[in-house]
């Protein structure tokens, strides 16, 4: 606990891949190493109190470390999110809420300007489904991303994309263009 608090005070994020949260998993952890075993609720409370980022699988662990290495620790729990799918925006909102992240609304004073950059079928929201009519068109998505980021008080921005299925190689360029526009 003291090491985590010391790291937190220095702005150094700590990420934990906690196993042994099920009854059997906890028993296996105790019999194998005896480390980080016990009530999952107690550990989650400890992690929350000390600022430890808790993940539940190796993919989350690696992606979290990658994010922290590239972007650094978020300055707040507020996000601005983008996806080219209404379902994706909904999933993003649902999952973020589960891990105590927030999507603040778009500043009402900038809503009209953002709406003017979007296709008529789009709804101004955060997270934002910028819709397929402008998907992959960097000259159209960059202004949307830029305006939305400035219109929401957020510590981080996230772009969520579906990975193209095998055989859909022709669509990769659209994903790449949106990623480039987002990264600018």
For each feature predicted by the language model, list its residue ranges.
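Catalytic-core regions of core metabolic enzymes
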Residues: 1-184
């Amino acid at each position: 606990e003291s090491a985590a608090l010391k790291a937190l005070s220095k702005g150094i994020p700590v990420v934990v891949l906690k196993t042994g949260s099920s009854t059997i998993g906890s028993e296996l952890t105790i019999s194998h190493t005896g480390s980080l075993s016990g009530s999952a609720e107690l550990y989650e409370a400890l992690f929350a109190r000390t600022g430890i980022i808790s993940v539940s699988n190796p993919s989350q662990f690696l992606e979290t470390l990658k994010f922290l290495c590239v972007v650094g620790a978020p300055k707040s729990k507020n996000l601005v999110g983008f996806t080219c799918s209404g379902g994706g925006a909904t999933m993003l909102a649902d999952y973020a809420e589960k891990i105590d992240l927030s999507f603040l609304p778009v500043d009402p004073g900038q809503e009209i300007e953002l709406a003017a950059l979007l296709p008529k079928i789009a709804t101004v929201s955060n997270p934002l489904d910028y819709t397929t009519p402008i998907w992959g068109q960097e000259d159209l998505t960059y202004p949307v991303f830029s305006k939305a980021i400035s219109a929401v008080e957020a510590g981080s921005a996230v772009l969520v994309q579906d990975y193209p299925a095998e055989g859909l190689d022709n669509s990769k360029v659209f994903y790449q263009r949106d990623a480039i526009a987002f990264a600018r």
